């Protein structure tokens, strides 16, 4: 299917989209810079507008849908899929990714090396079928057949052109995926993953002191930033407050 992202400023980009492909993922993998933060339906940052009936809204009991007026054609890019060729209106600037940036893509990965490091907290590694380069602070979204929808996990390591991603995973009360992982007896678990994505990243060329606060996004992304900074000996010249 052909999808056209556009805004009222006249900026527009046309891409090919797969059947049942999530519209945010389709745009990002084709290099279109789209509005998003969580990519999983929590924040509502990717709200868009399409002609009613052209998009499967896939409404769920998620916080991101609270201010979405579905009857008027609004939906979330991170949940919606196209029914047919369609136009998607966005209330934001549109542009293409820099040529040197790693575009996100789908691949199969195996989660292994489970190790308990604290109560209800484990570390584990994703072994990828293809290598990726990611910025410190970025994340991936993962999908397992036993759980509906995607879940986001930030990497704790930093390595360019890597086929291994390290995670910290906390078992959440009523967390369907984490409950499954903590109950599983398997040595490895197969996932579909999409990434790298995320805009809250570390750029050492900015040459600034760092203030790092772990909130709703957790500590994992900050660990990746610290790893990258340590590799560069960044803190020999700049300060960090945690």
What is the role of each PLM region?
Residues 82, 94, 145-149, 195-200:
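Short, charged beta-turn/beta-strand-edge "cap" motif at the junction between a beta-strand
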Residues 13, 34, 39, 130, ...:
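Short, conserved secondary-structure segments in the cores of folded domains
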Residues 1-34:
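N-terminal pre-ligand scaffold of iron-sulfur
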Residues 99-190, 208:
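Ferredoxin-reductase
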Residues 162-163, 173-242:
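FNR/FR-type flavoprotein reductase catalytic core
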Residues 22, 26-35, 45-94:
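Iron-sulfur (Fe-S) cluster-binding segments and ferredoxin-like electron-carrier domains
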Residues 16, 37, 69, 81, ...:
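Residue-level "contact hotspot" at macromolecular interaction interfaces
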